[in-house]
């Protein structure tokens, strides 16, 4: 391919990242669990890394993870050798690639290597914890400008009209499919959360009691309903605006 080597590295590095991410996702969904103790001959998924269409047998889990690691290692090498800078957190850079590598190592039971890779992300990515991530009522978990986000989608509002987007299903604030069925946490799981954990304030165990404060934010629609343990996690600044909002795929706290 023509072009500057830095540009080629940037494009090719992202391509290898996406293939690693795709196989990593698929083998966890459709293949056997990776066993850290070895003998990963259980069925994984079909490996197809060439331009072909003929039927192929499923590869073993070990073979799939070998392919995954080859791709993500090459992605890290190429993205580390480019001078190109991403313009949006929906794009891939070296730190996101290292974050995925940390996830892969963790899944393979390689704890120390995973921790070392994650530490590189924490130390070098420039991402920082944001004090109001769990307390703000403006764009909570829906805005990639949050300094904790390493990677996330950034759709245009017109790309997801009406209710065909993640927040249309998950946000209790947007006029959406869950107007009558608010998204909530399992009460026994809620009880396991420490009272000193700031995230516990995202849920409302007595939401159906109008006299219990604070009250959860609900969409301004005729069908709005309340349910105990409902959530105010995916909050948007303008719930009346139709269309998709940003969705986090990788965040700094995951690496800590």
Model feature map: region roles:
Residues 1-17, 25-253:
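Structured, solvent-exposed acidic/aromatic patches
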